[in-house]
Amino acid sequence: MPQAPDQITRNLWHVVAATSELPIGIVQTTLLLDTPLALTRGNDGEPVVWLRSDEEQGDEIDADTILERLPVRTAYGYTWTCLGTPTDDLFPIPEFAEPDRVNMSCGSIGIHVSAPRAVENFLDMGHFPYVHTDILGSEPHTEVKEYDVEVSEERDEVLATRCRFMQPRAAKSATTAMEVEYVYRVPHPYCAVLYKSC
């Protein structure tokens, strides 16, 4: 039986859906920290999230009839909720508001993995040559070079910089291999942000 999340984790904001993919008046279901949730958008377009009882994926529902709701935020194109009492605001992604930036959801894929393990794998460049062969890495270029890590109490995040890796096809437009530099931000135990130069 899964262990219940600690109160600190329950009080964090967690992503539950790409807001643009959440239909109006149709139930979507998900699990958050082993807690069954249901969600939809009301006629006003605002997301509504609640503890799932007998609702099924695809059921029609009037969001106005949902009285016991979980807290909801929309930010960065996603719907966020909290199972406890949210104590903090969401972490900033200042680039999201840049007027010349195109922001999009690239879809989501359900995988059977814990949130900490998903973040750990996302941060691990060592898998590039073996999992993303001939795109993000290839043998014999398997070295993960030394990089810098900063734990910032002021920003409440971990920042890894100078993360360099030789990539055969770092971008769709790439015609030759190049060394790419990554910056990883971990501003939340279950969220990571990637900046890539190519």
List where the protein language model places each region.
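N-terminal pre-ligand scaffold of iron-sulfur
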Residues: 1-53, 61-86, 167
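Detector for the c-type heme attachment site
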Residues: 56
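C-terminal catalytic domain of Rieske-type non-heme iron oxygenases
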Residues: 43, 87-198
